[in-house]
Curated annotation (Swiss-Prot):
Its EC number is 5.1.99.6. (6S)-NADPHX binds at N68, N69, G70, G71, D72, G137, F138, S139, F140, K141, P142, P143, D166. One of its GO terms (molecular function) is metal ion binding. Disulfide bonds: none annotated. The lineage of its organism: Eukaryota, Metazoa, Ecdysozoa, Arthropoda, Hexapoda. It comes from the Eukaryota. This is NAD(P)H-hydrate epimerase. K(+) binds at N69, D133, S169. Transmembrane segments: none annotated.
């Protein structure tokens, strides 16, 4: 049976990947973000995949937080652009570290716009077809900081479908949706292994991404991950 990780286990698995298997943060972030882009493309295909017809592209608002989840979002945005989408980044609190600065710089050179103000519910409905939620990961602890209140309000009130990376933002990593959080993504992309909160996910699509977990680590934690089909970077869980 597929294992769902609690917060301590998720942190420990990450530490083992970094310290024992010598993966770098940017290496795992690239693989994770790429798998997220593939999951998005499966669930929300753009009519203009593979061509430059900007007018017909699926417009995606990628909301990035200050940590690794936000970095995954920046990578995801870059790959979505290469796949025929038109991503726009909302990055309210950029991280002043070379890794994140470089990821954002790459997006800028690929002509991916970054907006400085969170759009209203009405503005978002007019401008975007999809929102990628890359705000908070499994290290999140409430309350939500003031920098992210407006985007959290947008994601809870919008009718636009939302794709959440690893953890729906504002959810408890183990207990799921908290009383003051109404965020209900249509797509959840669990990374490495699903977290306990994913058991409370009621959306339409649940995918697993991050095809990089060594077999010995899978056995050590009895993860029982599903087999990825062929050369796929993500696998559907439900």
């Amino acid at each position: 049976m597929l294992k769902y990780l609690n917060q301590a286990e998720a942190i420990k698995v990450d530490q083992i990947l970094f310290n024992e298997y010598k993966f770098s943060v940017d290496q795992l972030m690239e693989l994770a973000g790429l798998s997220c882009a593939h999951a998005v493309a499966k669930c929300f295909p753009s009519p203009c995949q593979g061509n430059d017809d900007k007018a017909g592209k699926l417009r995606v608002l990628v909301c990035c937080g200050p940590g690794n989840n936000g970095g995954d979002g920046l990578v995801c945005a870059r790959h979505l652009a290469l796949m025929g989408y038109e991503p726009t980044i909302y990055y309210p609190k950029p991280t002043a570290k070379p890794l994140y600065e470089n990821l954002h710089h790459q997006c800028e050179l690929m002509e991916i716009s970054t907006i400085s103000q969170c759009p209203s519910v009405e503005e978002a409905a007019h401008s975007y077809h999809l929102i990628v939620d890359a705000l908070f990961g499994f290290s999140f602890k409430p309350p939500v900081r003031s920098d992210f209140l407006s985007v959290m309000e947008l994601m809870q009130q919008t009718k636009i479908p939302i794709a959440s990376i690893d953890i729906p933002s504002g959810w408890d990593v183990e207990k799921g949706k908290l009383n003051d959080c109404e965020l209900e993504p249509k797509l959840l992309i669990s990374l490495t292994a699903p977290k306990l909160c994913a058991k409370h996910f009621k959306g339409q699509y649940h995918y697993l991404g991050g095809r990089f977990v060594p077999p010995a680590l899978q056995r050590q934690y009895e993860l029982n991950l599903p087999n990825y089909p062929g050369t796929e970077l993500c696998v559907k869980l439900s």
